[in-house]
Amino acid sequence: MANKLRLGIPKGSLQDATIALFKRAGWNIYADGRSYFPSIDDSEIECMLIRAQEMARYVDHGVLDAGLTGIDWVVESGLDVASVTTLTYAKQSRRKVRWVLAVPESSDYEKAEDLEGKIIATELVETCKRYFATKGVNVKVEFSWGATEVKPPMLADAIVEVTETGSSLKANHLKIIDTVMESETHLIASKAALADAWKRQKMDQIATMLRGAIDAQAQVGLMLNVKRANLDAVLAVLPALNSPTISQLSDSEWVAVNTILEERVARDVIPRLKAAGGAGIVEYPLNKVVL
């Protein structure tokens, strides 16, 4: 029987971002809206769509060998699964998300201790209970099935909700008074899968390529030609990931320079390179950067 890795893809808010990340990493996943078993162009992987909230449970039970989910849901589950790698991406951005304690803007609540005896609505029930317990604050934590932002002040006094930008909370006239936890996506695996040499190698391959795709998102490649007489001036401008690659051109007076830099600084660096003597400057996108 051929080796096969059973991989959980998060259904819901992370689904599109995850499929797009796999595409940049070299795998095409095709998700039919009616099927929970997406196809993938790798005969060694079998995909299944699972909600991020349940991923740790199915990995722990051995239904899946590995899966992608937020570390928040792993902590919430309390299950003993392993993290293969951290992958910092979310629905809208390439940064961690926060679970925050939020209250109505019009309220006098300024800190967790002000909520003694109050009702807190959240999806992250156990984590929320632990948070208030560590502060010695007695509250009633209620599970929220969604639309949590609209519950204060009529259905709850405060909420613990996940946010990337805070814009949804502001739109619902809520203010953040504390951060309960930060979270980011992890590739998790069962202990049994990690003990299998082939599955471990396959998971390491996936982790390497996914990390490479994430690292490449904020980077661009840059190549240019420069006269040897101006090379030191050009190199002084470049904030390289590693030392730039310098190649001799057919004209002995000229060399080619290749490097990688953050996309956000390219707009400032390119004019300075030109002023320092760079010519034929080309910026190009990167699919993967494997460090």
Regions found by a protein language model. Give the residues of each.
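Small-molecule-sensing regulatory modules
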Residues: 2-44, 49, 69-98, 106-291
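Short, structured active-site "lid" loops
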Residues: 44-65
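Signature of uroporphyrinogen-III synthase
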Residues: 57, 98-102
